[in-house]
C-alpha cells in the first residue's frame, strides 16, 4: 500500500478511536507519521509510527529510548481491519496494565504481560495509571 494512503487511513482510525494521540502527530517527508501519548503515571509513553507502510507501536522508556516496540505489517488495504484491531489490542493492553513496562535488575527496560511479571526477580514494574 502506498505510504501516504496508508498513513491517512491509520490517522483516520486514530482520530475515531484514540483522539488523545492526535495533538502529537508529526508528519514526515516520506508520507509517514509518528505520534505518542504520555502515561498517566508520567513514567513512559506509547508511540505509534507508520514508517515503511507498516504500523510500529512501542514504549518510550523513562530514559527516552524507544527500543521496545513491535511491527504490524499491513501491505494490502484488505489487511487494514486486522492491523487496526492488533494496534487497538496493544494500546488497550498497555493502558489497562496488562502489558507493562519493567526495568530488570541490570537496569534494562522491556515490556511483558503483567501476568508473567511475578517471575521477574529483582525487577521493577511501571504502571500506565497513576
Tell me what each language-model feature is.
Residues 41-82, 125-130:
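Intrinsically disordered, low-complexity regulatory segments enriched in Ser/Thr/Pro
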Residues 16-28, 101:
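Short secondary-structure junctions
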Residues 2-21:
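Amphipathic alpha-helical segments
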Residues 65-81, 85, 89, 93-105:
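Surface-exposed, interaction-prone regions used to assemble/regulate multi-protein complexes
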Residues 3-4, 16, 89-130:
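Acidic, proline/glycine-rich low-complexity IDRs
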Residues 27-37:
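Ser/Thr-rich, low-complexity intrinsically disordered terminal regions
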Amino acid at each position: 500500500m502506498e505510504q501516504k494512503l496508508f498513513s491517512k487511513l491509520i490517522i483516520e482510525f486514530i482520530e475515531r478511536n484514540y483522539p488523545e494521540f492526535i495533538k502529537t502527530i508529526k508528519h514526515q517527508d516520506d508520507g509517514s507519521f509518528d505520534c505518542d501519548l504520555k502515561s498517566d503515571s508520567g513514567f513512559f509513553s506509547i508511540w505509534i509510527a507508520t514508517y515503511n507502510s507498516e504500523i510500529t507501536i512501542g514504549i518510550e522508556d523513562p530514559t527516552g529510548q524507544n527500543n521496545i516496540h513491535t511491527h504490524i505489517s499491513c501491505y494490502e488495504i484488505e489487511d487494514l481491519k486486522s492491523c487496526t484491531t492488533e494496534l487497538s489490542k496493544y494500546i488497550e493492553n498497555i493502558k489497562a496494565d496488562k502489558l507493562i513496562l519493567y526495568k530488570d535488575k541490570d537496569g534494562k527496560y522491556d515490556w511483558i504481560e503483567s501476568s508473567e511479571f511475578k517471575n521477574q526477580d529483582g525487577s521493577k514494574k511501571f504502571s500506565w495509571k497513576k
